[in-house]
Amino acid sequence: MVNAIPVEDTESPVSWQEWLNKSNDAPVFFILNSLAKPDPVAHFYLNNWVEEAFPLYSGTPMRKMLKQSPWLVQAKVNNLFQIGAVLNKHELSDNSWGWAYRSHKSWQEQLTHWQRRQLVTLNGEQVIFRMMDTRVFGAMVSAFTPSDWSLMLAPVTELMIDLSQTTHFHRPKECGQGNDDIPFTLGEHLQLVWLHSPYGLKVLSSSLYNDLWENHGVMAKKLDQPEGSLEPRIEQWLRQKLEAGQRIENMSGQDYLLAMEQENNRSTYL
């Protein structure tokens, strides 16, 4: 297990308004989730807050998914006060809208970096990392090691994100410069915190639920009584396994069926 070094701000909590408008020579940039409701990218354009913006899937292997693309946005300096007021009131979008950071790197350097980091390695396979979704990235960033920072967050000097409260991160002093040619791996320590997060557990529960209906439809219909109860029961089953210290990342619908069969057999013999 890799030990994460906490990099949260140890001072009193900082509001969006304070952070966005404090004296700093590093410009503010946003990673926005265009699938959040309402679309925060549209909100930025509607309010004329955009200095520069670009969809990160454009020109990459994910270009066919352009409508789902995260956006890199540099906000106009004169609008930071207004943006801060909206974010403080949680009026921009839902809780998946994205996050903000400061950087001294050029626009092109940042754009190149983020486009290369949309794909990461998970269990030896290349997968899309939905880092623009606060529920995904926010579950992991607190566990980032200096090595994770140097690779995934190479341009970032400071980062602000809405977790249980607005949280401010500084770049760890131990960070190197990073190398975009080195693939970023979602290590065991990041997978662990992801699966222990409410959204991570819900995503896995939904995956098992869909697997059951697609591959074991008859059994899924039988188990889904009363109707709509199956997915919450799967989530509860996974949570119990986590609390017992068991690994759940490779669980499938078949595993759930087997567990239910064993449970029924035990009940029969009682």
Which residues are covered by each model-predicted region?
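Glycine/small-residue-rich interface belts in oligomeric ring/scaffold proteins
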Residues: 45-77
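A contiguous, surface-oriented mixed alpha/beta subdomain in the mid-to-C-terminal portion of proteins
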Residues: 2-13, 17-20, 25-58, 103-270
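A broadly used, surface-exposed interaction patch
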Residues: 64-114
